[in-house]
């Protein structure tokens, strides 16, 4: 396997979880990962200190990047995607820093080189083989409903609107089709719609997902209304919508500093 694979961990106020996330990068996983970057989005807790301490004492092959301003989750993705392109990576794996996803769930994809057949391998929390722990019934059924609605609009089977464990071919990221997408939590939803609009070869893969001590930034009613608006705009004119400026604040360059 000669591909360069980047592991990208977005982080914001994850002091309780980030060490557990970094501990997921065991020997079996490291066999497939070329480089690891943690992109901190101006955390106001001790997240940065936790990562620095981990790098000093346990793993020196991790880089900590700190955004020059809070770009939100979508903006951190743009930082990492740009890093992957500039440094000639072939693939980038996204693992959220809040310890809800399990990186080992993607080991079969890596071992069997399944990822080579696809532009995107998306972790799916709501497939038959998926495992959910501590997830409320209302959120589960809400996701089922929206997966169904997205399936109707895209005319493809959708199993997840955006989990925190995904893998992308850097080849499709080079033209920055995602740059105008929202820097907010809706970034992943736009990435999904874009995959259908640009006819990316896409795989949903069952993963495990847990909620323990994480703090959700997702306000369900507001989020649901925004998703419905997104679907309406996509259905009305997919080309116009997917190429439109969706950001509240236009940023020409998403800058970050490498701390260590």
Regions found by a protein language model. Give the residues of each.
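Short beta-strand/loop segment that forms part of the nucleotide-sugar
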Residues: 33-43, 65-66
């Amino acid at each position: 396997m000669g591909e360069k694979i980047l592991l990208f961990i977005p982080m914001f106020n994850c002091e309780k979880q980030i060490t557990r996330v970094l501990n997921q990068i065991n020997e079996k996983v490291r066999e497939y990962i070329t480089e690891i970057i943690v992109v901190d989005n101006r955390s106001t807790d001790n997240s940065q200190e936790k990562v620095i301490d981990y790098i000093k004492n346990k793993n020196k092959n991790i880089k900590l990047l700190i955004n020059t301003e809070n770009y939100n989750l979508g903006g951190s993705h743009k930082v990492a995607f740009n890093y992957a392109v500039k440094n000639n990576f072939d693939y980038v794996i996204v693992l959220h820093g809040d310890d809800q996803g399990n990186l080992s769930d993607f080991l079969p994809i890596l071992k069997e080189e399944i990822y080579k057949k696809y532009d995107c391998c998306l972790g799916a929390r709501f497939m038959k083989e998926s495992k959910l722990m501590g997830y409320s019934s209302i959120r589960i059924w809400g996701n089922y409903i929206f997966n169904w609605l997205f399936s109707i609009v895209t005319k493809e089977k959708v199993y997840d609107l955006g989990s925190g464990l995904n893998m992308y071919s850097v080849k499709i990221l080079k033209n920055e089709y995602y740059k105008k997408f929202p820097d907010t939590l809706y970034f992943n939803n736009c990435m999904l719609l874009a995959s259908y609009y640009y006819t990316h070869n896409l795989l949903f893969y069952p993963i495990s997902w847990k909620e323990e001590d994480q703090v959700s930034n997702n306000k369900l009613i507001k989020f649901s209304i925004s998703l419905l608006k997104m679907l309406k705009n996509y259905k009305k004119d997919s080309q116009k919508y997917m190429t439109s400026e969706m950001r509240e604040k236009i940023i020409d360059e998403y800058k970050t500093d490498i701390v260590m």
